[in-house]
């Protein structure tokens, strides 16, 4: 599990949902009949919440006011499993609160309550002391700047310098016109309008996009410059050349918090040793999930996997798979594995499993799961490609990706008629066997294994 330190402006997002069908007799304004209220984590806290949804360990650093909103905010963070030891209380300010009023699923007005004053000397010292204490423990840092007073120029540069000194990845979601504030960061994530404003350059052509990113790289020493382009995806530089990672088409309901989702998913992907292109693809998929929901929504790993793997109808998230299986009464067979470098032994095993029932469901370990189980050099083949290859086999009916170390949650949900494992589990505990009607062990075809294939490639390469 990656450990990420998120620093920035903490915002409470408050939503009033209802319907508006008449005007007030007091003034020509609509009257909202409130049907529902909700309070969400916003700003840097939404970044932290997104990371938690993606199974990261998060330490959050920022300030709230000494008020009811601040107390509720900290309580919500703790409920989400976010470490709040770096959340400081500022008695001189209110907790930043954005109230959105929504009628018939359309936002009609937003009311902001905030104080943007810089932090006082004591709070700055306490904040920096916390960061210095955590910097060696964490894997990466995110600065989420909403221009609410926490991340001024001096503090931002101090944090970036500290992160670089300890060789930590540091990403910044920028605000304002002066990007020297973020110089020497690993990556920044401005949108088109923000970058145009900062550089006084219209990003209306391939040439200008490339020029803008080169300025970020050469003038501000940003190692991985990129710009988010809404429906046009994400553009970045790779070896001096402009690369566009297209967005994933999906109906847009609400873009609130999409930028937070992008920087959270980019950070996690890069920390998992993904290339910048792979990280952008992952971020685009995560953004596609959240813009399809109302409010500061979250994307789960399962939802992102569905978006990334939607090229094959057999690849489903667990919720969708359960809905599909409810419609039939056939005998369900379940097995699971990494299936890294799919080979004849795998295919033979799956054919035998399918012969035991009507529907064969394969639980597939995610990339992160495999790294935890087998080390950082695995998997060889990405989960997207492994899922597609499995789904392409006629004996496999459905593939569901899981991010845990074991498939117990899948088995609990599916309650298969037959649970299948390899014969190497003879006299060993088969996880979830008590939840299936029957457990069967199948012999593997001799002479086939991923490890053997890898060793053969190594020998051939060395020869």
From Swiss-Prot:
Keywords tagged on the record: ATP-binding, Carbohydrate metabolism, Kinase, Lipopolysaccharide biosynthesis, Multifunctional enzyme, Nucleotide-binding, Nucleotidyltransferase, Transferase
Binding site for ATP: 191-194
Pathway(s) of this molecule: Nucleotide-sugar biosynthesis; ADP-L-glycero-beta-D-manno-heptose biosynthesis; ADP-L-glycero-beta-D-manno-heptose from D-glycero-beta-D-manno-heptose 7-phosphate: step 1/4; Nucleotide-sugar biosynthesis; ADP-L-glycero-beta-D-manno-heptose biosynthesis; ADP-L-glycero-beta-D-manno-heptose from D-glycero-beta-D-manno-heptose 7-phosphate: step 3/4; Bacterial outer membrane biogenesis; LPS core biosynthesis
Region named Ribokinase: 1-315
UniProt EC number: 2.7.1.167, 2.7.7.70
Catalytic activity: D-glycero-beta-D-manno-heptose 7-phosphate + ATP = D-glycero-beta-D-manno-heptose 1,7-bisphosphate + ADP + H(+); D-glycero-beta-D-manno-heptose 1-phosphate + ATP + H(+) = ADP-D-glycero-beta-D-manno-heptose + diphosphate
GO annotations of cellular component type: cytosol
Record keyword Nucleotidyltransferase present: yes
Protease keyword on record: no
Family classification: In the N-terminal section; belongs to the carbohydrate kinase PfkB family. In the C-terminal section; belongs to the cytidylyltransferase family.
Subunit structure: Homodimer.
Function recorded in the entry: Catalyzes the ADP transfer from ATP to D-glycero-beta-D-manno-heptose 1-phosphate, yielding ADP-D-glycero-beta-D-manno-heptose.
Protein name: Bifunctional protein HldE
Species of origin: Helicobacter pylori (strain J99 / ATCC 700824) (Campylobacter pylori J99)
């Amino acid at each position: 599990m990656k450990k990420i330190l998120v620093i920035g402006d903490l915002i409470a997002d408050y939503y009033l949902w209802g319907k508006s069908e008449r005007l007030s007799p007091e003034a020509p304004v609509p009257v909202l009949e409130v049907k529902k209220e909700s309070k969400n984590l916003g700003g840097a806290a939404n970044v932290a919440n997104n990371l938690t949804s993606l199974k990261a360990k998060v330490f959050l650093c920022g300030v709230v006011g000494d008020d009811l909103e601040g107390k509720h905010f900290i309580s919500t963070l703790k409920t989400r499993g976010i470490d709040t030891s770096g959340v400081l209380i500022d008695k001189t300010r209110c907790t930043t609160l954005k109230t959105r009023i929504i009628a018939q699923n359309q936002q009609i007005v937003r009311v902001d309550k905030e104080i943007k004053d810089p932090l006082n000397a004591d709070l700055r010292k306490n904040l920096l002391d916390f960061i210095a204490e955590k910097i060696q423990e964490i894997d990466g840092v995110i600065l989420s700047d909403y221009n609410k007073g926490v991340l001024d120029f001096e503090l931002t540069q101090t944090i970036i310098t500290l992160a670089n000194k300890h060789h930590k990845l540091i990403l910044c979601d920028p605000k304002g016109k002066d990007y020297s504030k973020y110089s020497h960061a690993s990556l920044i994530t401005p949108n088109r309008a923000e970058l145009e404003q900062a550089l006084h350059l219209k990003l209306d052509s391939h040439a200008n996009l490339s020029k803008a990113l080169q300025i970020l790289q050469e003038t501000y020493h940003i190692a991985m410059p990129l710009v988010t382009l809404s429906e046009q995806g994400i553009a970045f530089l790779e070896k001096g050349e402009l690369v566009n990672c297209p967005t994933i088409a999906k109906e847009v309901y609400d873009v609130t918090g999409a930028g937070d989702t992008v920087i959270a998913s980019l950070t996690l992907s890069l920390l998992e040793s993904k290339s910048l292109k792979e990280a952008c693809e992952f971020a685009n998929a995560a953004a596609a999930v959240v813009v399809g929901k109302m409010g500061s929504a979250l994307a789960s790993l399962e939802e992102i996997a569905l978006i990334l793997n939607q090229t094959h109808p057999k690849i489903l998230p667990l919720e969708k798979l359960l809905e599909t299986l409810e419609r039939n009464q056939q005998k369900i067979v379940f097995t699971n594995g990494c299936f890294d470098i799919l080979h004849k032994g795998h295919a033979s095993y799956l054919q035998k499993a399918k012969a035991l029932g009507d529907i064969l469901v394969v639980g597939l370990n995610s990339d992160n799961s495999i790294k935890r189980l087998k080390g950082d050099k695995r998997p060889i083949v990405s989960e997207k490609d492994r899922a597609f290859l499995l789904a392409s086999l006629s004996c496999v009916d459905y593939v569901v990706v899981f991010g845990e170390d074991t498939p117990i949650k899948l088995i609990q949900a599916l309650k298969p008629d037959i649970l299948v494992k390899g014969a190497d589990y003879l006299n060993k505990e088969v996880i979830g066997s008590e939840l299936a009607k029957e457990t069967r062990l199948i012999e593997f075809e001799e002479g086939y294994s991923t490890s053997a294939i890898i060793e053969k490639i190594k020998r051939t390469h060395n020869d």
